[in-house]
Regions:
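Short glycine-enriched, charge-decorated loop/helix-capping segments at active-site entrances
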Residues: 51-59, 150-163
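N-terminal [4Fe-4S]-dependent radical SAM core
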Residues: 1-34, 54, 75-77
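Canonical radical SAM enzyme core domain
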Residues: 54-68, 89-133, 140-146, 166-170
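Hydrophobic faces of well-ordered beta-strands that scaffold small-molecule active sites
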Residues: 31-35, 80-84, 113-115, 136-138
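Short Fe-S-cluster ligation motifs
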Residues: 68-86
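Short loop/turn motifs at secondary-structure junctions
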Residues: 44, 77-78, 109, 132
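Conserved C-terminal portion of the radical SAM core fold
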Residues: 79-82, 134-135, 162-172
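Canonical Radical SAM [4Fe-4S] cluster-binding loop centered on the CxxxCxxC motif
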Residues: 21-64
Length: 172
């Protein structure tokens, strides 16, 4: 289904997944938004297009994000989830905190907030403690710290795995 959103058409799934011989059922229109807040990253992962990117600042606008979320709702499209990603979001943690603050307003507080992080920086740990997150994905591509350091192309401090004060039920 195409929905006119401020003069641009967005495609929104109209039916749920068909299970066996069951007929398809209509679903209410919804979207998940992926918000890349920066290309900058503290790691140099061999497999990542953002590996070691130095560009930290982003032309990202928090008021524009809030306006889009509200506008989609007004257009009858439910914003189910906002995924905050990067690069590494914690390299622009003040911006991410502004997003969380804006998404805590009554008209946006029903949107699921998700963080994707490598969790290696002290500010990553601080961001993960924020109560507005509904879920958090932490990229741990190996259980062995030495091998993980090789994959990430940087040394990993033991403090990176200090989850004190972080709601582990939100961590994936």
């Amino acid at each position: 289904m195409l929905i006119d959103f401020r003069g641009k058409y967005i495609s929104v799934k109209e039916f749920d997944c068909q299970l066996g011989n069951q007929p398809k059922a209509r679903i209410a229109p919804f979207v998940n938004l992926f918000v890349k807040v920066t290309k900058g990253c503290n790691a140099k992962c061999l497999f990542c297009s953002n590996a070691g990117a130095l560009e930290v600042q982003s032309p990202f606008s928090v008021p524009k994000l809030i306006d889009i979320v509200k506008g989609l709702k007004e257009a009858g499209v439910r914003v189910s989830r906002v995924n905050v990603t990067g690069g590494e979001p914690s390299v622009v943690s003040p911006l991410v905190e502004d997003i969380l603050s804006g998404m805590s307003a009554p008209e946006t507080s029903d949107v699921h907030m998700h963080l994707n992080t490598n969790g290696l920086l002290p500010q990553s740990q601080e961001l993960m403690r924020h109560p507005r997150w509904d879920s958090i994905s932490m990229s741990l591509h190996h259980y062995d710290t030495k091998k993980l350091s090789e994959l990430y192309g940087c040394s990993i401090a033991e403090s990176a795995f200090g989850f004190e004060g972080i709601n582990l039920q939100k961590l994936n």
